[in-house]
Amino acid sequence: KHFAVHPECYAMGPDGKRRGVRNARSQICYTNPETYRLVLEALKGFVEADRKECPDDPPLVYDFTQQDNAEFLCLCPDCRREIARYDRGDGHAQGGDAGLQLAFVNRLARDIRATYPDVIIRTFAYNSTECAPKPGTISVEPNVRIWWCDLYSRSDHTVPLETSGHFNAARAQTLKDWLALTDNVEIWDYMLYDATYPEVSVRAIARDIGLLASGHVRAVFVEAEYTDQPFYELNTYLQ
């Protein structure tokens, strides 16, 4: 909709070019002032329309987050400088992108709260934004909710997250880093996503749900729709 008029509002890739939303990996430019103006204007329009359509029971949670299947947000010089502020030292995917997105979302949350104090802005911690920003660099507004995604490609869902000596322990720490930053966290989990594995996640489910509950996670959404998994009905019941 906006690329022809405002290409500067779209993410710059490592090749220095900006691409529109028809490109699967295209994002927005998070530091461009016009980007923010357009997003805030659209958000206010959605909220106002919903209040008119459903005055007695309007939606309260609005999602703003990155596009799927992207390895970075924006690599323009201004965004790179912001990324460096929040980076834990291992690249943009180690807190830098999360900080870049969270700063943008925090601003949205503050501005929308002035008119609609009951509205919550939800944003993903996923792919390049899955790791929390460097401690002490940013806070989370009270009307911002983090939706942390436990990527099935980065953990073993047949083993509990908190398993000493297992690579899942690093995933558990990533979640704990977010919970140290805010208690307004939801989970998008897969439990056991692939259809081809002769494995069962039953033992892991109970311990993982216990971990999430003890961490004061607000809600859990489980994506595990392949019906030819072993013990599919039991897994679904437990989830």
Predicted regions, residues:
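Catalytic-core regions of glycoside hydrolase
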Residues: K1-P33, R37, E41-Q239
